[in-house]
């Protein structure tokens, strides 16, 4: 096997790119990523916290990849070691956080949707995750809400209201996954992780939500990256096989 190509990194979104949404990575994908690491530096960047990313990619995720950026890179690991951490609480302050959370909970309380469960707002190190149905819902309920949301645009409408109400907070709202959206200060999207990748002059990013409003859009459009849109983990395998391993096809 040839030596790694210097100055090049393959950077991957998690949900919809390396795994099905909120599902565990397949053995095939885990094996492929280790093969890929032999020829290029490999990193992952997800909106979820490290616990959730570990559930999907394995408990040894920070050692299985060269870079692991959880919460869009607001929590950053390199070679298994923590190299950076940003705090939403320190940035916004408790008063603004309370104002935003109170309004959002009132909005959800008044929201008429078929079902609601629990954990409507999840407080993470560098962002808030807001779910109209509640993160405690089952996988079947997730799938049903996703279909309902595509028609009724529950998340899109809610984001529009919050964006207008809290314009003075300078927040970014990013819809991702099946049931929720992330809220964080402007500039704290996935492009945040690029500050840790100054040594790379060729950054290939792979993601599924690369459209405007999707949580992969900003990094996909960044002038520092070569963006690749995928629709499934299977397509990720195929594109990477052609790009980096010189194969005509990936998974069969």
From Swiss-Prot:
Location within or outside the cell: Cytoplasm
InterPro entries listed in its UniProt record: HAD-like_sf (IPR036412), HAD-SF_hydro_IIB (IPR006379), HAD_sf (IPR023214), PMM (IPR005002), PMM_cap (IPR043169)
Residues where alpha-D-mannose 1-phosphate binds: 22, 124, 135, 142, 180, 182
Keyword vocabulary terms for this entry: Cytoplasm, Isomerase, Magnesium, Metal-binding
One GO MF term attached to the UniProt entry: phosphomannomutase activity
E.C. code: 5.4.2.8
Pfam families: PMM
GO biological process entries: GDP-mannose biosynthetic process; mannose metabolic process; protein N-linked glycosylation
Pathway the protein acts in: Nucleotide-sugar biosynthesis; GDP-alpha-D-mannose biosynthesis; alpha-D-mannose 1-phosphate from D-fructose 6-phosphate: step 2/2
Binding-site positions, Mg(2+) 2: 220, 225
Catalytic residues, chain numbering: 13 (nucleophile), 15 (proton donor/acceptor)
Enzyme class: isomerase
Cofactor(s) this protein cannot do without: Mg(2+)
GO CC annotation, single: cytosol
Catalytic activity, as annotated: alpha-D-mannose 1-phosphate = D-mannose 6-phosphate
Binding, Mg(2+) 1: 13, 15, 208
Family from the record: Belongs to the eukaryotic PMM family.
Free-text function comment from the UniProt entry: Catalyzes the interconversion of mannose-6-phosphate to mannose-1-phosphate, the precursor for the synthesis of GDP-mannose. GDP-mannose is an essential sugar nucleotide for the synthesis of D-mannose-containing cell wall polysaccharides (galactomannans and glucomannans), glycolipids, glycoproteins and the antioxidant L-ascorbate. Can complement the yeast temperature-sensitive mutant sec53-6.
Subunit description: Homodimer.
Identification of the protein by name: Phosphomannomutase
Organism: Solanum lycopersicum
Taxonomic placement: Eukaryota, Viridiplantae, Streptophyta, Embryophyta, Tracheophyta
